[in-house]
Amino acid sequence: MTNMRKSHPLIKMVNHSFIDLPTPSNISAWWNFGSLLGVCLMLQIITGLFLAMHYTADTLTAFSSXTHICRDVNYGWLIRYAHANGASVFFIFLYLHIGRGIYYGSYQFKETWNIGVILLLMVMGTAFMGYVLPWGQMSFWGATVITNLLSAIPYMGPTLVEWIWGGFSVDKATLTRFFAFHFILPFIITAMVMIHLLFLHETGSNNPSGLNSDSDKIPFHPYYSIKDILGLMFMLLLLLTLVLFSPDLLGDPDNYTPANPLNTPPHIKPEWYFLFAYAILRSIPNKLGGVLALALSILILMLFPIMHVSKQRSMSFRPFSQCLLWTLVANLIILTWIGGQPVEHPFIIIGQLASISYFCIILILMPTSSFMENKMLKW
């Protein structure tokens, strides 16, 4: 009799994806982040569901409902902070996952990569709308500033902004619709993750060497399931340390003040994981130019498969490209720092230089270094 996991229509799909999946024998810990992101997504959906049971999407009661969750609901503080810090951990892993894809040339799986970029945009949108829900000062003003950016779109901009707001300012209608979208998007993201995996399993995983590994595959379980559990332990350690010791470390103190349309906070800034894009937005004096640069700072990821000119897939054996990638990482850290600083000298000029460097490294220097490496190897 055939084993049930190989014959049952449903269990067979799980088997082919997580148990008998042929996996390269040499993939490193950098390949752990995919499964960790899946766990993060599940954790966010579960904690979010419990928060939604106690939350009210109304301008008068949203702030106090969140306070009620922390004070009166059993372990409500734990659920809320696990959800807030879970988002931070989610983004840390997302950025590491993307960085791994760039370093090892995984973007050559074009469908998987492009769906991944769409996933990134969806997760960013979900996180932004989630930040608005507690209805603190930074929630309100963050929503006002970011939605206002759409008014830079020629001809239809102002109408579009009012349509998104559901009125003439960020108000009850905005909060209600943001809650609805924030609730539904993670489930759409889950469906997209399945498509992401479907395309990945069409080609099989990449590996650190960037070479074809069809001749050397091992089953996913038990080898990589155990390896992923180790990564999961580290993730839980990081998350629980944040939640239990310093839950407000990554938050903004202004968000503990209820939203007040008559009082603007001195520095409006998003959560830390959007600061690099926010710095690029602010570094361009023109509104439409800033919005375009903001969009391009993420959408530029879609150009990676087109701009790959190296004869080698991975950067493992390309020292020039490695140096440039780590320069890009340093540049992104500088942008993140600048995004959290006030708009004054010398931060303005540092932000502008870092923004120019960001696009130059990706669009000019990386393809040039790949071309030079090809020449040096006489390819």
Curated annotation (Swiss-Prot):
GO terms for molecular function: metal ion binding; ubiquinol-cytochrome-c reductase activity. PROSITE patterns: CYTB_CTER (PS51003), CYTB_NTER (PS51002). Binds 2 heme b groups non-covalently. Keywords: Electron transport, Heme, Iron, Membrane, Metal-binding, Mitochondrion, Mitochondrion inner membrane, Respiratory chain, Transmembrane, Transmembrane helix, Transport, Ubiquinone. A ubiquinone binds at residue 201. Belongs to the cytochrome b family. One of its GO terms (cellular component) is mitochondrial inner membrane. It comes from Isothrix bistriata (Yellow-crowned brush-tailed rat). GO terms for biological process: mitochondrial electron transport, ubiquinol to cytochrome c. This is Cytochrome b.
